[in-house]
Amino acid sequence: MTDYKDTLNLPQTDFPMRANLPEREPQTLARWQTLDLYRKIRKDREGQPKFILHDGPPYANGRAHLGTAFNKTLKDIVVKSKTLSGFDAPFVPGWDCHGLPIELNVEKKLGKDKLSANAFRQACRDYAFSQIELQRDDFQRLGVLGDWQHPYLTMDFGYEADTVRALAKIVANGHLLRGQKPVHWCAACGSALAEAEVEYRDKASPAVDVGFEAVDAEAVRQRFGVKNATTRVLVPIWTTTPWTLPANEAVSVHPELHYALVKSELQNQPVYLILAKDLVDSAMQRYGVDDYEVHGNLKGDALEGMQLQHPFLDRIVPIILGEHVTTEAGTGNVHTAPAHGLEDYFVAEKYNLPINNPVDARGRFIPDTFLVGGQPVFKANEPIIVLLADSGHLLHSETIQHSYPHCWRHKTPLIFRTTPQWFIGMNKNGLRERALAEIEKVTWLPAWGEARIGKMVADRPDWCISRQRLWGIPIPLFIHKKSGELHPKSPALMEKVAQLIEKESVDAWFDLDPKVLLGDDADHYEKVTDVLDVWFDSGVTHFCVLEKRRELKVPADIYLEGSDQHRGWFQSSLLTSLAIRDKAPYKSVLTYGFVVDSQGRKMSKSLGNVILPADVVKNLGADVLRLWAASMDYTVEVNVSDEILKRASDAYRRIRNTARFLLSNLYDFDPKKDKVAVDQLVALDRWAIFTTQKLQEKIITAYDRYRFPAIYQAIHNFCTVEMGSFYLDIIKDRLYTSKESGLPRRSAQTALYYIAEAFVRWIAPIISFTADEIWQFMPGDREPSVFLTQWFSDFPNAALSGEEEQRWQLLLQIRDEVNKALETYRNEGKIGSALAAEVVLYADERLNAAIATLGEELRFVLITSEASVLPFNEKSKAAFDTALPGLALEINVSEFEKCARCWQRRSSVGQIKEHADLCDRCVSNAFEDGEMRQFA
């Protein structure tokens, strides 16, 4: 048999079938760096409209985990898609560098006491730099393009100085408060914590009911209308923090709740109890009392001013009114310790009650505290409960499990503790109202983010921005020793401090002799040594980065972070921006869910479900990780597992194989010379170009709307359905067997060229390494990188009429039914391949109209050796109906010989003596002028 291989146009390309991403991606990365790709893009986009995605700074501690990898990948997809849309979209990465975690690591390594404060801060700075280098390598290895040589660091001298300037503007605008307020306090940190540093965990706590005895029982009884009685009156409170009882200054009741006087017997003694009417039954059940009488009914405001004896201190405390009292649990009477609770503090402030804080910075009672002096607060619960029991004031005690605030770093329970702190006042100068108004102007993605952050801002207390730590940006203020007032020239003095910090770091403030700035006035002022909350550091990036860097702008077009940042960076950025310039720092905010395993569990070493991005990159490649990130619905929790990553790897392989098919059939195609005019294109090729063009519109819209899973699905379907199992399958015959430079083949190549030009750009924001690798093998003159181009726009006008489009949709369905039938025949051993079959289609008028025009070329669409069409009502006995209404099929095994070149079974095989093993079509294609195709 003659070998006709040399007469065929078999696919050829150097683009590798095997991706080998772990080895190949670093080579691409090196090429980008040699090319200075990021700078080239900036130069290329100069003067174009800006699009700014502002990078929320990750903490400079530890390697990138899957959450940060997901974060940076989504950001990179956005930035690259905007670049392809023609925007100048610079990406300036940043790092959050101050704060406790770095202090703890340095302390563990070097010891805090062995170093001077300045040496300790330098050690923290060095440690942060080392962590940044690790993370920078991780992010670059993921293919994230950005200004990695010039990131912003919150510990850069310039940034530290600008943070002081931001604070100076906030001071000048009247938003700073100094107050002695209860704040979340971590004894292990020895410092206040911000709301965003608090996490809630289950904790076992003692829940106790404690009786406060009325000083004038007779007067109380009379208020309730009970006369001629001598029984004592108790006001029971319910609390899960018995350790706060030494700081009790009052008992709060709700002014509008109804309270009852309940007569009962407790501890073998008659007693009257004042309880919220709605809680009487549950309280008495708790006390194990079945027999009791309810006397009288008063609203809470009638109890105001009643005096009670503290259960174990020589202290008389009043009943006061508080809107925070509820009937959800307890007794309706709330133990009020202003030093240890924010609501307690606010209600006590109205009554001008003393605020005594008996707890030190390490969470221990000060030495002279009655009974529990020197003890850690949580250990003080037991002796207090024992004392209450011995004195007859303990009405009930049990242990409960409840959600309780913990330190995000130490995982230890927090306390509320009153200390002198600096606050941004939420109600000062209308900050809260303006924040709520600005939230409504921002686009929140998903939309529920607006309500979430709105509620948080509406409910939040003043923002405590001061911390008692070494490693941080100082609050460079001077306080008058007698009046406690800020120095009248504070903003101007802060600018001078900023100039010093710019040159010498934050040490300049801590080392500063006040006389340098204040002269003789220095003796009257005290220098503040607190540092700023790290959420303030990162919250002013809009001022220190967006406003300062020439290539950026404020407001940013988008902030993109995890949904936990509604209470973190989104909020701190919003509040500082409003306090500085009276508008939000962002136009839109996109949030995503936590990365969890396939069962919805958080990643943890103890569960053994931790997947490190470095391992994924090492084993599968960064592009597989990026494809996984794009495929996930980020509006909910994001699942990951080895199985999920394997699915992403399989999808990647399909995309790569599609690209390889395109490239391998364009090896001899020069777009300048070989492109076929649209009016000469084979109809199927025109359909393919039109389909590609339509899909591109959808893909670009999806990129603009940040609908990454929809893009993934569209590309996946394009590779597997429209292209893989339909168009590319059909045109193989034409590509391989038609005359090399004949119109049928060049028409198909023209379509493949347009598809490849569009396709490589679609995938570029997601699988960036692979897209740029494909780009190097594309035909024609081009830029050195796909990222120096825009979405492909040089499509011919291949628009189809609605009728034509409908016809091709029907053809897809018809071919699907034929394929199913042929597969059955194959499985039954009746045929080896589809080319061994001859198909008769019995079609109704609707379907007939779609396929009749194809005539002889229908067999190429169905990839059978013969295909004919007859009316549906002429079905033979051998025909069978399909799932497509109006279509029946009859399949016969061809009796003709197989062509040695195209493998079709045709009656013309053997008819031409010189080429007895070829069909007439192959003789024409191989040795004569070649066939013509009109439709397929």
Swiss-Prot record:
Key words of the record: Aminoacyl-tRNA synthetase, ATP-binding, Cytoplasm, Ligase, Metal-binding, Nucleotide-binding, Protein biosynthesis, Zinc
Name under which the protein is recorded: Isoleucine--tRNA ligase
Domains as described in the record: IleRS has two distinct active sites: one for aminoacylation and one for editing. The misactivated valine is translocated from the active site to the editing site, which sterically excludes the correctly activated isoleucine. The single editing site contains two valyl binding pockets, one specific for each substrate (Val-AMP or Val-tRNA(Ile)).
Gene Ontology CC annotations of this record: cytosol
Cofactor details (free text): Binds 1 zinc ion per subunit.
Family: Belongs to the class-I aminoacyl-tRNA synthetase family. IleS type 1 subfamily.
Quaternary organization: Monomer.
Catalyzed reaction equations: tRNA(Ile) + L-isoleucine + ATP = L-isoleucyl-tRNA(Ile) + AMP + diphosphate
Pfam family, one: tRNA-synt_1
Protein source organism: Coxiella burnetii (strain Dugway 5J108-111)
Motif 'HIGH' region, residue numbers: 58-68
